[in-house]
A protein has these predicted regions:
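A composition-driven surface/loop motif
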Residues: 1-254
Length: 254
């Protein structure tokens, strides 16, 4: 697709087999499901989806060649917003999610069981970040960390609910800002990743007026509430489907 258009519909961009977006602009102002197909490839373009259900959904049980459904983002800018939905996801795949490049910003209201990135781990699916910049904000009820087979480190924080408009920033030890995003909706979990992040390095994660230094110890790192361990994460995160407490102060969690 190499055009700009605006939609207001139940499912805004759909293909029964495979959908590839190669450039241009797509703006979905209001919908239930945003972009839906068993296979979705985003190569380039400027895409903004405001939905009440999933922003991007790799649906079904298998693709035309019999493999798992999947979402692959190789470039472009993808912004997924959900200010009012419940049990909704930013990117939802019944199989895999692969982010290899581009800019991906997700902001779902942080109550209910809204999950910024939801993949089919129960079906053998994986969620890999191999490149690009990702800031994915949502609820903390259905958390999944990224897969350890990711080539690029990521950090998942879950804890106290942060207000709409809270600015998220990540800085290195030289005070260089690596990423920043002002989340339009409240959130209780955020995942960040960018090409500059390296294992063993220390970063400062800032949420509004509070901040904490964190040293990355594994590819899919996580900090937050006490509980079980999510897929690929450090101890201290809840398992998918469990509800963590959200009344702790951020600084006391880390």
């Amino acid at each position: 697709m190499q055009y700009r258009h605006e939609w207001k519909h139940e499912i805004s961009v759909f293909d029964v087999l495979c959908l590839r977006i190669a450039g241009g602009g797509i703006t979905v102002n209001s919908c239930s499901e945003g972009i839906e197909s068993p296979e979705i490839f985003i190569e380039d373009g400027d895409i903004t989806v405001t939905s009440t259900d999933d922003g991007i959904n790799a649906c079904g049980t298998e693709t035309a060649d019999g493999s798992l459904p999947g979402v692959t983002i190789n470039g472009g800018t993808v912004t997924l917003l959900n200010p009012s939905g419940r049990d909704a996801d930013g990117i939802d795949s019944n199989g895999n999610i692969d982010i290899n490049g581009g800019l991906v910003y997700i902001s779902l209201v942080g109550d209910g069981s809204n999950c910024a990135l939801d993949y089919g781990s129960e079906n053998g699916g994986v969620c890999r970040i191999n490149g690009g910049t990702v800031v994915a904000c949502g609820g903390s009820t259905m958390l999944e960390t990224m897969s350890e087979t990711s080539a690029q480190p990521s950090l998942l924080y879950a804890g106290a609910t942060q207000a709409a408009g809270t600015e998220i920033a990540l800085q290195d030890t030289d005070d260089k800002t690596l990423l920043t995003f002002a989340a339009p909706n409240s959130f209780s979990a955020v995942l960040v990743s960018c090409p500059e992040m390296q294992l063993g390095s220390t970063y400062t994660l800032t949420l509004g007026a509070i901040s904490q230094e964190i040293t990355l110890t594994q590819v899919a790192d996580s900090y937050g509430v006490s509980g079980g361990t999510g897929q690929g994460g450090s101890p201290g995160l809840p398992q998918k489907g469990l509800t963590p407490p959200i009344d702790s102060d951020f600084l006391s969690l880390l």
